[in-house]
Amino acid sequence: MRFRWKFFGSLLCVTGLLLVLYRQLGNVPQPPPGPASAQGSPSLTATSGYFRALEDHVPRRDARQGGKKKTNWNNVRAPEQKPNPPMPEEWMHLAVVACGDRLEETVTMLKSAVLFSFKKIKFHIFAEDSLKSDFQMKLEIWPQQISRKIEYKIYPITFPGGNTQEWKKLFKPCAAQRLFLPMLLQDVDSLLYVDTDVLFLRPLDHVWAFLRRFNDTQLAAMAPEHEISKIGWYSRFARHPFYGTTGVNSGVMLMNLTRIRNQHFKNNMIPAGLTWEEMLHPLYQKYKNYITWGDQDLLNIIFYFNPEMLYVFPCHWNYRPDHCMYGSNCKAAEEEGVSILHGNRGVYHDEKQPAFKAFYEVIRDYTFDDNLFQSMYFPLQSKFLESVHTLCGRIPQVFLKQIEKTMKMMYERRVVVHIRSDV
């Protein structure tokens, strides 16, 4: 009997414990009902519970991110790449002054400039009125592949500030015009001036590149008048100040016109500096009885007082008969070859220096459609064989080295362009 009561007592305790557990489990909170789209959809897994639809899922903000919204880099667009504006096309500017019978000589010089150059060139031709139509006729018949590389403008001979007749008679007719280029070409920044009796034997681009070598004070570049002071003209005969030990030759003159216009120049007339325009006429008045080579002498005087403003380039950029008629005395030409030939003393038109005349004739007679080697280089070699009896003709390697390089360069460039156009 006592055992039965113990049994029933234990059974009641167990039953009561189960009832308590059942009530506790029955009070577990149920998940809230999902959205309508989810309520009507079948269970996604066999496990009982609730899953938010993927398209409605909003990730929690991580507390460590300071409440900032996380960037979804997959949806970020790269900024639109705008094409760079095209670089303005660089033009080289070449100036020449032609008077009297210099038409043919000038056109031959212009032909040599455009023939071997890469960038486009603007010709600034200062000429007497009687030559204007002749220049136009000569330049307009150039073939299209040449004419599209150039622009030209013909200007009248002009000397600002009056004294026209006085300036016009200085040295050679119209030669003093070059002194006034900074004032006459106000919209031109830089310029290469050459005499009419100059021939380019390599791209004008190469001498144009000297502009980048100018330091902060330099505004012009010229070559020495001579390499040896003992036989130089200025060192022996000049009665006025001149640059350096041998002076400079102005037949090839590279100028930063902007700097020239803005600079004040030291002088021996007044303590203060003078602008280029203010200085020219007083300087001429002071030295006109002592100068022989006109405007070139005035330039030598200017750079004597302002040597820091001049860049001096090697003699092969202005190679003249003086460099070979007394023996070879331009070491740079022996190494590099002649880059710019300057046939002063009228050597293109007489028999005194046939080596110079040979270049002039083959470039003058060359037609743009001909083969460079067949129509220019080979005839040039033949003409040099006829000049070996002269001092200049005895050094053909000096004359021919650079133009041979130039022709090979032009040939290779044309071949590459032709191949690319076919591809």
UniProtKB/Swiss-Prot annotation:
Residue stretches spanning the membrane: 7-26
Glycan-bearing residues: 215, 256
Keyword Cell cycle: no
Topological domains, Lumenal: 27-423
Predominant place of localization: membrane
GO CC field: membrane
Protein's GO biological process: O-glycan processing
SUPFAM superfamilies: Nucleotide-diphospho-sugar transferases (SSF53448)
Alphabetized Gene3D superfamilies for the sequence: Spore Coat Polysaccharide Biosynthesis Protein SpsA, Chain A
InterPro entries with a match to the protein in the record: Glyco_trans_8, Glycosyltransferase_8, Nucleotide-diphossugar_trans
Domain of life the protein comes from: Eukaryota
CDD domains linked: GT8_like_2 (cd06430)
Disordered as annotated region, ranges: 60-85
EC number: 2.4.2.42
Keywords: Glycoprotein, Glycosyltransferase, Membrane, Signal-anchor, Transferase, Transmembrane, Transmembrane helix
Segments on the Cytoplasmic face: 1-6
Cellular location(s): Membrane
Reaction it catalyzes: 3-O-(beta-D-glucosyl)-L-seryl-[EGF-like domain protein] + UDP-alpha-D-xylose = 3-O-[alpha-D-xylosyl-(1->3)-beta-D-glucosyl]-L-seryl-[EGF-like domain protein] + UDP + H(+)
One term of GO molecular function: UDP-D-xylose:beta-D-glucoside alpha-1,3-D-xylosyltransferase activity
Known role: Glycosyltransferase which elongates the O-linked glucose attached to EGF-like repeats in the extracellular domain of Notch proteins by catalyzing the addition of xylose.
Family: Belongs to the glycosyltransferase 8 family.
Name listed for the protein in its UniProt record: Glucoside xylosyltransferase 2
Organism expressing this protein natively: Xenopus laevis (African clawed frog)
Biological classification of the source: Eukaryota, Metazoa, Chordata, Craniata, Vertebrata
Designated gene of the protein: gxylt2
